[in-house]
Amino acid sequence: AATCKETPPTWSGHLFEISTDNPRRADISYSREEKKIDTTDYKGVPLRTTLDDYATGTKYCRKSNLTGTIPTFGVPDKLPSPAGPHYLGGKLPSTGVLVLDFYGEK
């Protein structure tokens, strides 16, 4: 069975969702220590920035309540770096987050 190690408590990266219906590109900054996820969506130019503040339970952009705990993200064991496309957080294809390349230390 696939296992996942958690990512470092603080990271940032680029998100690419390739889809004919709703493609997406975003920059994400994640801090488990501050319990915040900062997301800027793009379509050529920045469209919107949201901030999920799990410390206060508030989501900013359109202010709304935020419930639950901050999500953790994982990297599968024995993942070479860089390694091409991999799904993180799921044991089966298409059940997690697709990552095209992972750079960094485990």
Curated annotation (Swiss-Prot):
Subunit annotation: Probable heterotrimer consisting of an alpha chain and two beta chains. The alpha chain can probably have different glycosylation states.
This protein's name: Halilectin 3, beta chain
GO molecular function, one term: carbohydrate binding
PTM notes: Glycosylated.
Job of this protein: Lectin with affinity for N-acetyl-galactosamine, carragenan and glycoprotein porcine stomach mucin (PSM). Has metal-independent hemagglutinating activity towards erythrocytes from rabbit and human. Hemagglutinating activity is not inhibited by D-galactose, D-glucose, D-mannose, D-fucose, methyl-alpha-D-galactopyranoside, methyl-alpha-D-glucopyranoside, N-acetyl-glucosamine, N-acetyl-mannosamine, D-fructose, alpha-D-lactose, beta-D-lactose, D-lactulose, D-sucrose, fucoidan or glycoproteins thyroglobulin and ovalmucoid.
Residue positions with a glycan: 65
Keywords: Glycoprotein, Lectin
pH dependence of activity: Optimum pH is 6-7 for hemagglutinating activity. Activity drops rapidly at lower or higher pH.
Temperature dependence per UniProt: Thermostable. Retains hemagglutinating activity after incubation at 60 degrees Celsius for 1 hour. At higher temperatures activity drops drastically.
